[in-house]
Design a protein with these regions (language model features):
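Phosphate/pyrophosphate-binding loop motifs in nucleotide- or prenyl diphosphate-using proteins
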Residues: 1-181
Length: 181
């Protein structure tokens, strides 16, 4: 890997994706960027959660997001094949984590306002970034063949982040607030 972290290649709005030169506002590049942003936010959340099991779950999600990003990159570079793909077992792992975390928080009967201690707040923000990443991937389905497990995985991830934020709030003794509308 080069020691220089700039090339000047992107100074005019293009980037390199494998062997392809593409515009930075390309829909695939946008989706990859949203997944990358989510990964960064999970890193911040992980450093701010008080629960070791939740932190380990976030580290797992971060690694899996690289698999999602690789799958998206392969849409534009046909010479690149990801070493791993998101599959039904990955989705099942998230569903189990959602069920386990949901069992530790009260049943939800109203909308919940985002926030709480920093760990929960970062998880709430990560959830919204996950939803945006999911929408940007859905937007690719009209032009590209997307692994259906990626779509399901991204949907479940935002659900898990919501439940984890609620769990952290409960663990920290923060009462949920509900919108008045």
């Amino acid at each position: 890997m080069p020691k220089i972290f700039y090339t000047g290649f992107g100074d005019k709005g293009d980037t390199q994706l494998g062997s392809e030169k593409v515009r930075k506002d390309n829909d695939v590049i946008n989706a990859i960027g949203n997944v990358d942003e989510l990964n960064s936010e999970l890193g911040v959340a992980m450093q701010n959660v008080s629960d070791e099991k939740a932190a380990k779950q976030l580290a797992y999600l971060q690694n899996k997001l690289f698999t999602v990003g690789a799958e998206l990159a392969s849409l534009m570079d046909k010479r690149f094949t990801p070493k791993k793909e998101v599959g039904a077992e990955d989705v099942k792992q998230l569903e189990i984590a959602i069920e386990e975390s949901s069992a530790m928080v009260p049943e939800i009967k109203k909308f919940v306002l985002p926030g709480g201690p920093s760990g929960a707040a970062y998880l709430d923000r990560a959830r919204t970034i996950a939803r945006r990443a999911e929408r940007s991937i859905v937007g690719l389905t009209g032009s590209y063949r997307i692994n259906p497990a990626v779509l399901t995985y991204m949907n479940r991830m935002s659900s898990l982040l919501f439940v984890l934020a609620r769990y952290i709030n409960k663990k920290e003794g923060v009462e949920e607030m509900h919108p008045e509308y």
